[in-house]
Regions:
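A cross-family phosphate/adenosyl-ligand binding-site feature
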Residues: 1-60, 64-128
């Protein structure tokens, strides 16, 4: 995570494949949010997220902390305005998951939807 010369630190690396690239930060701490929002790329994760934003590639940040301070909210807004998708880990109980595994699968499906990955996981289909 400290090798700022690794492939993901370069926009060329992201554009090298035949498939569109995306970056998922799961889970994403408020420390990481703050570093990326401020442009302080202290490690490869921060730098790769910075590159994803500058290259206009999908960046999905699944945040895990609550409650949120005003500083957290400003940082999240800054990242959203820069193009990131902010997804607090808030599972949907309206699908009535039978257990934690179903709950996690459904949330993973929502993450996959954000980056255009095809999947067969449960989706909300409206009221029955």
């Amino acid at each position: 995570a400290e090798d700022l010369g690794a492939g993901p630190a370069s926009g060329s690396w992201w554009r090298g494949g035949s498939e569109p690239a995306a970056m998922l930060l799961v889970p994403c701490s408020m420390g990481t949010v703050g570093a990326i929002a401020s442009g302080a790329t202290r490690n490869l994760v921060h730098r790769a997220a910075d590159v994803a934003l500058k290259e206009r590639l999908p960046l999905v940040m699944v945040t895990r902390e609550s409650p949120l301070s005003a500083i957290h909210l400003r940082n999240l807004l800054s990242l959203r305005e820069a193009g990131a998708v902010i997804m607090p880990f808030s599972p949907c109980f309206y699908l009535r998951p039978a257990g934690v595994e179903e709950l996690l699968e459904q949330f993973c499906g929502r993450i996959f939807d954000q980056v255009g990955l095809t999947h067969g996981l449960a989706r909300w289909a409206g009221q029955e």
